[in-house]
Amino acid sequence: MNYIHCLNNISAQGTDLLTSDYELTDNIEAAQGILVRSAGMLDMEFSENLLAIARAGAGVNNIPLERCAEEGIVVFNTPGANANAVKELVLCGMLLASRGIVGGIEWCKENAEDPAIGKTAEKAKKQFAGREIKGKTLGVIGLGAIGAEVANAALGLGMEVMGYDPFVSVNAAWKVLPAVQHVTDLADIYRECDYITIHVPAVSGTIGMIDEAACALMKEGVVFLNFSRDTLVDAPAMASALASGKVGCYVTDFATPEVMAMENAIVLPHLGASTEEAEDNCARMAVVELMDYIDNGNIVNSVNYPACQAGVCPEGMFRIAVLYNSSDLAMGSVTEILEPIVAEFDMVDNQRDEHGYALITLTENLADEVLERIAELDGAYLVRRVK
């Protein structure tokens, strides 16, 4: 029996997919897999039973990825599962920033007792006059699952769209409509766009990237939208740009004390993926990834190990997985152990940065002492009998 622990409430649309070989448990120490949304895991100590963590969502800055990798724990996320939900809120954010909607709603609430509010509103509405987004230029920084959907939807609303992503995958690039203008210099986005939305992960190269220098390059009165991570934007730089009018409005899904003090900021309480559909999609995807890894050893959508797939282990065959440091361990050392023992085996071996993963399907079931010999090799994080 495999045990799964949920650190957050996970949609039953996902947990109902668990087969009879799986059982939910409140005992995290016994769990082979953990399902998580936003719970903080950075300071957690992990049991030796734990094989994998699946994040029902895209962001993984609540999980210690490198430490997990070194402990042989594969971390998954669910890219694209919440893309439509976030896309819709980005479009909403552009409209909120453009049409005086927030101020108009507040005015109506403040004047709710006015018996002649209909006539008064006709006089007051001019202070909330806005601009249409049709014909304006949107810059999309990051053309992954969410960025691609935002770019395509903006085209449908009559906007000109520019996209920047030096790391875009081939699969992601195919999802972006040809009318999206790809640029190779981020400064072009800053200089030419009326609206800018950012959709990149918070990593060492992107944290604080929207700084004073970036804001200085932007068009006067630009609307900047951040539905990715709060740390991408340097708060003092954004506050200064808003105060000067360089940035006309900052729309963010991340409420912080610094942002709440900014003028002309529209702040939402992290609603990007907060829809029933997104939560269901993320939960289903996370559970499928977790089971496929535990049952078959396949890795799809990991954020700390390479993708590696060998399908379902055929009847009558056996399979082991080796998680290792590719700087210290070469798979030749493993084959040297296996070749005198096993008549035939097939290996799929991939690396991601310094972390490697090998799936080995064999005609014979290996004795425990053979697995122990592999596990004792320098650089081996974990050797697991999959089947």
Predicted regions and their residues:
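Rossmann-like adenosine-cofactor binding region
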Residues: 42-44, 166-259, 274
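Glycine-rich Rossmann-fold phosphate-binding loop(s) that bind the pyrophosphate
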Residues: 143-144
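Phosphate-binding beta-alpha-beta segment of Rossmann-like dinucleotide-binding domains, i.e.
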Residues: 79-137, 301-302
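N-terminal Rossmann-fold NAD(P) dinucleotide-binding loop
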Residues: 147-148
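NAD(P)-dependent dehydrogenase/reductase Rossmann-like domain
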Residues: 271-387
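An N-terminal-biased, well-structured beta-alpha scaffold segment characteristic
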Residues: 1-78, 211, 217, 234, ...
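Oxidoreductase and adenylate-handling cofactor-binding alpha/beta cores
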Residues: 87-106, 152-159, 285-298, 335
